[in-house]
């Protein structure tokens, strides 16, 4: 899908670049595949702000997307491609041969009328088909990759995202992720062929603050413009640099400080995303 620019009849339209969604379905989602979604405004069950700068935004309905794809060996037909306000990618409504319906992540080049299938055996290597990594040809572009068999896809799910299967080793598959990381995933984990739809999402320009507010994002206030009571970087006469290495409002290092501490899965990472690109 192409990008849309606008004749600047207002100041906000001068910079505005959005994705042309004219080819997407214009109706409402399937009611049996949706749930209500209440607005939290960044608050937890005690009413305290636990995530800053969230609140407002348009009301949403949550679409139940099937990330597990465990309805094996039943062919499904793509009914339509839909917009989903809860994610950056588009979703596809599929209807199985037995009459069941489901939403799946729409990969690039998937269109209404296409057939998709999920299997525990090898199937055709075409966008939307799901099978275990042990049967996918090396070099394939994949998305919605499981990290534990049966848990559902967790890797490469956002707009334009993908991973590449670069090898196999003793029952494990070696994946190269967009971040540059190379990691091992068990060969029985499922993955779907293709890259995720809406790759132009990274090129959009909101043009005005209000468009972020429609999404429920409030202005992100920098610590350096606060008072000392509000932030470690606050205070000072005139503009200051903060006077110390960047920290959170609670004094913990931020902006690049590594926080990963799951040593049990370190052995699954063959090449860190932090290693210098060669």
Swiss-Prot record:
Biased composition, class Basic residues, residue ranges: 210-221
Pfam family, one: Ribosomal_L2
Record GO terms (molecular function): rRNA binding; structural constituent of ribosome; transferase activity
GO biological process: cytoplasmic translation
Record bears the keyword Ribonucleoprotein: yes
InterPro entries linked: NA-bd_OB-fold, Rib_uL2_dom2, Ribosomal_uL2, Ribosomal_uL2_bac/org-type, Ribosomal_uL2_C, Ribosomal_uL2_CS, Ribosomal_uL2_dom3, Ribosomal_uL2_RNA-bd_dom
NCBIfam families (alphabetical): rplB_bact
HAMAP family: Ribosomal_uL2_B
Record's protein name: Large ribosomal subunit protein uL2
Organism of provenance: Rhizobium rhizogenes (strain K84 / ATCC BAA-868) (Agrobacterium radiobacter)
Gene: rplB
């Amino acid at each position: 899908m192409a990008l849309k620019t606008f004749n600047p009849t207002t100041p906000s339209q001068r910079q505005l670049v959005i994705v042309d969604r004219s080819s997407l379905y214009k109706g409402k989602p399937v009611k049996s595949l949706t749930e209500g979604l209440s607005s939290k405004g960044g608050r937890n069950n005690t009413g305290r702000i636990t995530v800053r700068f969230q609140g407002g935004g348009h009301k949403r309905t949550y679409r139940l997307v099937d990330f597990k794809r465990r309805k094996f060996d039943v062919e499904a037909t793509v009914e339509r491609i839909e917009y989903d306000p809860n994610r950056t990618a588009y979703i596809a409504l599929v209807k199985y041969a037995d009459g069941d319906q489901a939403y799946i992540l729409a990969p690039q080049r998937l269109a209404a009328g296409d057939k998709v299938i999920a299997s525990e055996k090898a199937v055709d290597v075409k966008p939307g088909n799901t099978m275990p990594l042990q049967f996918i040809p090396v070099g394939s572009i994949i998305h919605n990759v499981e990290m534990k068999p049966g848990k559902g896809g967790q890797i490469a799910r956002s707009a334009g995202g993908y991973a590449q299967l670069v090898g196999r080793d003793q029952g494990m598959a070696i994946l190269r992720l967009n971040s540059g990381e190379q990691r091992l995933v068990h060969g029985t984990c499922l993955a779907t062929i293709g890259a995720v739809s809406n790759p132009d999402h990274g090129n959009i320009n909101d043009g005005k603050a209000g468009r972020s507010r429609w999404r429920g994002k409030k202005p992100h206030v920098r610590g350096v413009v606060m008072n000392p009571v509000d932030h470690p970087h606050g205070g000072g006469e005139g503009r200051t640099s903060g006077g110390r290495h960047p920290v959170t409002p609670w004094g913990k290092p931020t902006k690049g400080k590594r926080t990963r501490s799951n040593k049990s899965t370190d052995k699954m990472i063959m090449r860190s995303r932090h290693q210098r690109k060669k």
